Design a protein with these regions (language model features):
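Glycine-rich oxoanion-binding loops at beta->alpha junctions
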Residues: 54-77, 167-175
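Intrinsic disorder/low-complexity segments
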Residues: 202-226, 287-296
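N-terminal amphipathic/basic leader segments beginning at the initiator methionine
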Residues: 1-60
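Short, well-ordered amphipathic alpha-helical segments that serve as non-catalytic structural scaffolds
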Residues: 64-75, 100-114, 247-260, 298-307
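A glycine- and small/hydrophobic-rich beta-loop-beta segment
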Residues: 273-307
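Conserved phosphate/anionic-ligand binding catalytic regions in large, soluble enzymes, centered on
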Residues: 32-37, 187-199, 262-270
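Short, surface-exposed loop/turn segments at secondary-structure boundaries that line and modulate
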Residues: 84, 88-97, 119-140, 262-284
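Glycine-rich, mobile lid/loop segments that gate access to catalytic sites or pores
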Residues: 104-105, 109-204, 224-255
Length: 307
């Protein structure tokens, strides 16, 4: 049977109207792994939609929640976002009031440069816990990333490299499918290798969403407090979809994918999945329900992880 989903190049810049970049700003320790250049590693990424997008998110249920997660929890309630700034090498977690100020400063700078409301900019961080962000580096990195922001394939590659920490390879995918008589594209990037056990919900609180299919024995513990390091995922799509339907679809997709993963059983303070849907595919919003859209989201989420 022929699949309705076609894997295509482009990752997060495959959908219409999305730009990305990944740069070096020296947050990470010097290294020679993927994304390194003369001993440096990319450690700051931008994902930007050319138009305001519908947004949905799923977040860690760890009682210790990092400032970037708290910021996203507040802002996704509005249902609209247009840009995401992500840094690696520092989780900005357990950093007190300064951590909150730094998360706000990251998004405020990007919003000013892109001439959009601060509420439309989201943030993600991963890396060392308990250390404040080197904001001079972060701010310089944001300005640098804006100069190379583009829809070129290498820009998506640079973005996924910039969110990696202990990952041994980049995790990214893009798919194309028909929806409402229009061709729709969806792309995703993800990071997370050792010490992960995502247990995410839309509110950052338990209980977790229930998988549509019967859970495995290990998944039956979803009501317990998992012993959860950081899993980040960012998905872009040019589908037009209402915020309520996107939230429902993402909850189902995460329940059937990321919330079933465990490596060493460690949950992060920063686990986050964000989806931006900018509507540029031109399909009718009224034809999409959460249950219909969860299938491509589930496939994209599951396909990000390399075999």
């Amino acid at each position: 049977m022929k699949s309705r989903f076609k894997v295509i190049p482009g990752s997060i810049v495959a959908p219409k109207g999305f730009l990305a970049s990944g740069v070096f700003c020296d947050i990470k320790r010097l290294g020679t792994g993927k994304g390194s250049e003369k001993g440096r590693k990319r450690d700051l990424a931008l994902i930007v939609s050319e138009v305001p997008a519908t947004v949905a998110g799923m977040f860690t249920t760890n009682q210790v929640c990092a400032p970037p997660v708290k910021l996203c929890l507040q802002r996704v309630k509005n249902g609209t976002a247009q840009a995401i700034v992500i840094n690696s090498g520092n989780a900005n977690a357990c950093t007190g009031k300064q951590g909150w100020k730094d998360a706000l400063a990251m998004t405020a700078l990007l919003a000013r440069q892109l001439h959009m409301p601060e509420e439309h900019v989201l943030a993600g961080s991963t890396g060392r816990i308990g250390v404040t962000l080197p904001m001079d580096n972060v701010q310089a990195g944001i300005l640098d990333a804006l100069t190379v922001l583009d829809d070129a394939l290498e820009c998506a590659d640079h973005a996924v490299e910039a969110i990696m920490t202990s990952d041994t390879r980049p995790k990214q995918v893009a798919v194309e499918f028909e929806l409402g008589g229009k061709t729709v594209r969806m792309g995703g990037i993800c990071k997370g290798a050792g010490m992960i056990q995502p247990g995410m919900s839309a509110t950052g609180r338990r209980p977790l969403p229930v998988p549509a299919k019967a859970p495995s024995a290990s998944a039956r513990n979803r009501g317990r407090a998992p012993g959860h390091a950081t899993m980040l995922c960012f998905i872009t799509t040019d589908a037009a979809i209402e915020a309520k339907a996107l939230r429902a679809a993402l909850q189902e997709a995460v329940a059937n994918s990321f919330n079933r993963i465990t490596v060493d059983g460690d949950m992060s303070t920063n686990d986050t999945v964000l989806v931006l849907a900018n509507g540029l595919a031109g399909n009718s919003r009224s034809t999409i329900h959460g249950s219909r859209f969860s299938n491509p989201l589930s496939i994209t989420s599951a396909s990000i992880w390399p075999k």
